[in-house]
Amino acid sequence: MSEFIRNEEVLRLAALGKTYNPGTPLEQQVLHDIDLRLGRGELTALIGPSGSGKSTLLNLIGLLDSPSAGELYLLGRPTHALDDAARTRLRNEAIGFVFQFHHLIPAFSVLDNVLMPLMIRHGKPTPAEVELALELLQAVDLRGFADKKANQISGGQQQRVAIARALVTRPALLLADEPTGNLDTKTAESVFALFRRFNREFGCAVLVVTHDPRLAASCARTVQLVDGRIVSDQANA
């Protein structure tokens, strides 16, 4: 595991805005002047009511969409002027994703699902990459399930596989959109415990969208979004 400098800047948003259908009768501004910084080793919850812009913001941060205003810096690099190929390359190299629905491939083994981002990147994984994937499965208590098909394990186990998959590329930034939305309370707490562990041990910045105030409070920091604006950004006790 490589050393990292805690709080070294991973992400910076400067006056970020997003408007859909600009210049038309359907124009709608959903994000307004968002300023945010995330550092290595920082675990941050993003909360807010439905329709507040959380998913839109996560899509912008994940380089899945482009802002209408402002700038997004990832690892110190401005992203606004990047072409599609460069954005895709930076996203694949620097960002891991965990969603409410795990999107595992049912007919593939648990191990192959974890390795999938590496297979997409450069084909057959190296022995070192396979070993890392197995280490991640060990960390999420699923090493013994490596050869099972993804559709042969429980929903909570599938979400843990998704976390291992998101980390196999050693991303600088991990984005999680309602990752516990379909899980019971005990399983949800175990998933958040994994985020805290990997945030601490891997040194990645983690941003988690959640509707659960208890889980948000377990993060080091909570950012609240209302009507497309950050109304609160505070450390948790």
Give the positions of each predicted feature.
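ABC-family P-loop ATPase nucleotide-binding domain
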Residues: M1-T19, S232-A237
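H-loop (His-switch) and adjacent beta-strand-loop-beta switch element
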Residues: T222-A235
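ABC family nucleotide-binding domain
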Residues: E8-L11, L16-S218, T222-L225
